[in-house]
Amino acid sequence: MRIDIVTLFPEFFVSPLQCSLLARAIAGGVCNIAITNPRDFAADRYRTVDDTPYGGGAGMVLKPEPLFAAVESLPIIAPRAVILLTPQGRPLKQVFLRSLAADYAQLVLLCGHYEGVDERVRAHLATHEISLGDFVLTGGEIPALALIDGIVRLLPGTVGNRASLESESFEDNLLEYPQYTRPADFRGWQVPEVLLSGHHAQIAHWRREQQLTRTRERRPDLLPPEA
């Protein structure tokens, strides 16, 4: 998969892309990540990418010309999605991450900034609009990193044990069951006996019940009414 990041702050991504899973995925050829700065496509010598909003109002709005030019300069690998990271977008869900990882060969991530982007970018350039939640960040760089991390770990060749992905939170619309490791007794807090029993059917049943209980308590919105 190719992932293109369109951002005014390329340096924001330098360290994260050189660490841990993302670094291994890039080095292993699982994904190719490129960064493009819209300032390189500005029409004036000041590299202007924003302007005041028509009709008045606070803040500055990202101009359409540099963003369109930046995206249009990229190679096209079909199928491709152009994703605008914005608080007005649909909340990011695991099911959408799975869809992106499975259905697309190229993702173009548009990182908004300042007061927002010209509406024509939303209407005629972006194919999707995604938000991390009901809060506002300085720009789209942090959401872009979250999206990249969530997608890349789903690509074949990134995570060694694919079975571990199937038991995580939000797979099957349930939160993950509690996890324990050694020691079995820490400060009097003991690992549940069933996990020490070696009885795989009982362990599977316990984990399923824990998933349901934890989801009911913390995220009942994930469950169907009859659950």
UniProtKB/Swiss-Prot annotation:
GO cellular component: cytosol
Keyword Transferase: yes
Family: Belongs to the RNA methyltransferase TrmD family.
Organism field: Gloeobacter violaceus (strain ATCC 29082 / PCC 7421)
Enzyme Commission number(s): 2.1.1.228
Catalyzed reactions: guanosine(37) in tRNA + S-adenosyl-L-methionine = N(1)-methylguanosine(37) in tRNA + S-adenosyl-L-homocysteine + H(+)
Annotated localization: Cytoplasm
tRNA processing in keyword set: yes
Protein name: tRNA (guanine-N(1)-)-methyltransferase
GO molecular function: tRNA (guanine(37)-N1)-methyltransferase activity
Binding, S-adenosyl-L-methionine: G112, L132, G133, D134, F135, V136, L137
Any Gene Ontology biological process: tRNA N1-guanine methylation
Subunit structure: Homodimer.
InterPro entries reported in the protein's UniProt record: Alpha/beta_knot_MTases (IPR029028), tRNA_m1G_MeTrfase_C_sf (IPR023148), tRNA_m1G_MeTrfase_TrmD (IPR002649), tRNA_m1G_MTases_N (IPR029026), tRNA_MeTrfase_TRMD/TRM10 (IPR016009)
UniProt function note: Specifically methylates guanosine-37 in various tRNAs.
